[in-house]
Amino acid sequence: PALIAAGLMGLALLATGSRTPLVATTLACAWLIIACWNKRSAWLLVCGVLVTLAVVRLYPEILLERGLSYRPELWAQTLSKVAQQPWQGFGLDAQLAILIADLNTSFSEPHNFALGVLYYTGIIGLAIWLAMHALALFQCWKHRSNYLFIVAGALLVYGIGAGLTEGGGILPRPKEHWLVTWIPLALIAALSIRTRQTQGALR
């Protein structure tokens, strides 16, 4: 049943034609395989690699048809703006406008979570942001015997994958991106606190 459900989910993802959830789901599955490593995980890893190669071979247009969707241009312009105030950023209430001349359209997000954090809070804020994620993943790995940490880690890894090519304005106000950023971090923090309290009560 689990394999059937996974297959249906994979087909649904392919049907959307969106590459971001494909990348994010692949990374989340990789986390689950590594965190729950056993003989079955090895077989799943092999099957996953074979399926990925088959999709790339049979349906290359899914990945290549739309090119890079102007992501490099968005990132380059964001970095050029960051260079003006690299350490402290422009502040949480700052406005970001990235003009793509070919589209005659201005974007308000860099389509990358880390670049968004860098723009608003600078290198200092980005360092804190990365440290939070590193610590959260470390806690999930450390307590991987608890399936709740494994699930929370998968949510966080999914968010990291999604944040590679989407979003950017995740700090000023609540929005849908919080479902794959702040909420997984909050869940991991809550699990860590509860685990520490439980361990302290047993001593």
For each feature predicted by the language model, list its residue ranges.
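Long extracytoplasmic/lumenal interhelical loops at the membrane interface
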Residues: L58-T121
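Membrane-embedded alpha-helical segments of multi-pass membrane proteins
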Residues: L22-A30, I124-I128, K175-P184
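Membrane-interface catalytic loops of GT-C/OST-like multi-pass glycosylation enzymes that act
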Residues: G17-T20, E109, E166-W178
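Transmembrane-helix signature of polytopic, lipid-linked glycan biosynthesis machinery
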Residues: L8-T16, V157-L171
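Transmembrane alpha-helices of multi-pass inner-membrane enzymes
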Residues: L155-I160, I170-R203
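Short juxtamembrane and helix-loop transition motifs at transmembrane-helix boundaries
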Residues: L3-A12, P110-G116, C140-W141
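Hydrophobic alpha-helical segments of polytopic membrane proteins
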Residues: P1-L58, S145, L187
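Hydrophobic transmembrane alpha-helices and their immediate junctions
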Residues: I123-I160
